[in-house]
Regions:
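Fe(II)/2-oxoglutarate oxygenase catalytic core
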Residues: 1-132
Length: 132
């Protein structure tokens, strides 16, 4: 017997309805900029982690849940609706702080997969990644 994914499932979803107002966007930007900034790194591949300017050139900070509670509630609502309509995972919840990223002129983040394929640390937990 071969088990396949249901035909209704999607693997990439794009939403075009605005989630945040311009004022809310500015509040998120301010929250991200007020946190400690660090050079973005890459990781997950054996022997290749840390700063890799061929894959990524940007600066990041992490937005604490307590700093933007309403933002996280709004994102979770969209995530749960999107999950129900396209993926069907059980018990979805936000477990990671939002990563705020700024790109200098010429900065970028090349195509990548957020996972540790070798599973040296622990099994992957992230089911859905979202970009705002």
């Amino acid at each position: 017997m071969i088990i396949t994914e249901p035909k209704w499932k999607s693997y990439m979803v794009e939403t075009t309805t605005p989630i945040f107002t311009p004022k809310q966007c500015q509040m998120i930007i301010n929250a991200g900029r007020s946190e400690p900034k660090q050079n973005a790194s890459v990781g997950g591949r054996e022997g290749k982690s840390g700063i890799d300017t061929e894959t990524r050139t940007s600066h990041i900070s992490w937005i604490p849940f307590s700093k933007t509670t309403e933002m996280y509630k709004d994102i979770e609502k969209v995530m749960k609706t999107t999950n129900g309509n396209h993926f069907g995972f059980d018990g979805m919840q936000i477990t990671e702080m939002a990563q705020y990223t700024e790109y200098p002129e010429g900065g970028f983040y090349d195509w990548h997969m957020d996972c540790d394929l070798i599973m040296t640390k622990e099994p992957p937990v992230r089911k859905i990644s979202m970009t705002l």
